[in-house]
């Protein structure tokens, strides 16, 4: 019986991986064509808005397939490239990439970091973790708000915090935000392009690197994600 279950789970994982991989190319084509069409000055404002909606949803689908593929690969016990990483530098790169998105809501992102923030890790996954945390802070942050990223060394650990002054999370939802596809506000998630996988992936990445993460939040005040990794 257990062998049949394991076979079934393996087939499910393989199916998820295959579907996610096959979706990437057509979704990329849709994104490319939408961006091309939006450059056409002869389109009406109504046409451009409709194309923009398609583009937003296509980008959301692209993010979803990428995250599903990453999760499927993890469940297949794929090897990860562990190397010496400068966590501070990687965080700077993520913040730089997300500045345009933050500016759309006039959100200021500040980074406060100590030196010597080195750890062993998979660079792609650590970048994804920080991307998800800061993107989440932007999506649920208030217009004209602030996001503070704080990185320090404490007891041979890298301690990081991503703190926003956004809408916050009610206590009833705090324990469930790590679940796959769990969304507190589905309409807001769709509007922001959320997939429901971001925080689930964050926790998996943290656990993979022998770290810990927890969340502190007060409704209408803001949210802080605090994580720790072994330092080298």
Per-region residue spans from a language model:
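Conserved micro-motifs of the catalytic ATP-binding
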Residues: 43, 76-83, 118-121
């Amino acid at each position: 019986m257990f062998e049949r279950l394991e076979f079934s789970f393996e087939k499910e994982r393989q199916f998820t991986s295959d579907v996610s991989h096959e979706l990437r190319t057509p979704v990329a084509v849709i994104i490319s064509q939408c961006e091309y069409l939006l450059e056409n000055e002869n389109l009406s404002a109504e046409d451009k808005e409709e194309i923009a909606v398609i583009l937003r949803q296509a980008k959301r689908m692209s993010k979803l397939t990428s995250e599903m593929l990453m999760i499927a690969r993890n469940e297949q016990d794929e090897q990860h490239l562990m190397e010496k990483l400068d966590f501070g530098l990687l965080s700077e790169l993520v913040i730089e990439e997300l500045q345009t998105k933050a500016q759309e809501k006039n959100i200021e992102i500040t980074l406060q970091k100590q030196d010597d923030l080195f750890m062993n890790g998979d660079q792609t996954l650590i970048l994804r973790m920080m991307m998800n945390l800061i993107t989440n802070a932007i999506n649920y942050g208030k217009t004209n708000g602030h996001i503070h990223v704080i990185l320090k060394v404490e007891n041979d650990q890298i301690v990081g915090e991503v703190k926003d002054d956004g809408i916050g999370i009610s206590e009833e939802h705090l324990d469930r935000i790590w679940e796959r596809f769990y969304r507190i506000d589905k309409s807001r998630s769709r509007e922001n392009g959320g997939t429901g996988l971001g925080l689930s992936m964050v926790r998996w990445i943290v656990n993979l690197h022998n770290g810990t993460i927890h969340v502190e939040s007060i409704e209408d005040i803001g949210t802080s994600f605090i994580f720790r990794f072994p330092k080298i």
